[in-house]
Amino acid sequence: MNYANFGLDFLNSVANAVVEGKKLDLASKGLQLKSRALDTERAFNYDRLAFEKHKFETNNDLKIYGDAMRISALRAAGLRINPYSNGRQIYQDEADLANLHSYYSFYKTD
C-alpha cells in the first residue's frame, strides 16, 4: 500500500467535498435569485392586470354614463343646460338681467 497516494487521495476527496459544497451554495443562491425574479415578475403582471381591469371599467363607465356625468358636472358648475338649444340662444329674462347688471355696473348709482 502506498501511503503517499493515500494522502493525495484523501486531500483530493476533501478538496472535492469543498468544491461541491461551494457549487451547492452557488446553486442555492441562483435558485433564490430566480425565485425572487419570478415573484417580482408575477407581482408586476398582477398589477398590470389590475390596471387593465380598472382602465376597462373606467372606459366602460364613461361610455355608459359619460354624457350624464358631463351634464351633471355642468349643472353643478351653474350652467344652464338646454338639450334643444345650440348653445347660442338665451332667454329674455337672462338678457334683461345682463342688461340690468351692465347698466348698474356702468352707471354707479349708489
Swiss-Prot record:
It comes from the Viruses. InterPro entries: Vesivirus_VP2 (IPR007996). It is found in: Virion; Host cytoplasm. Keywords: Capsid decoration protein, Capsid protein, Host cytoplasm, Virion. The N-terminus domain points away from the virion surface. Homooligomer. The portal-like structure consists in 12 copies of VP2. Interacts with capsid protein VP1. Translated by a ribosomal termination-reinitiation process from the bicistronic mRNA coding for VP1 and VP2. This is Minor capsid protein VP2. It comes from San Miguel sea lion virus serotype 4.
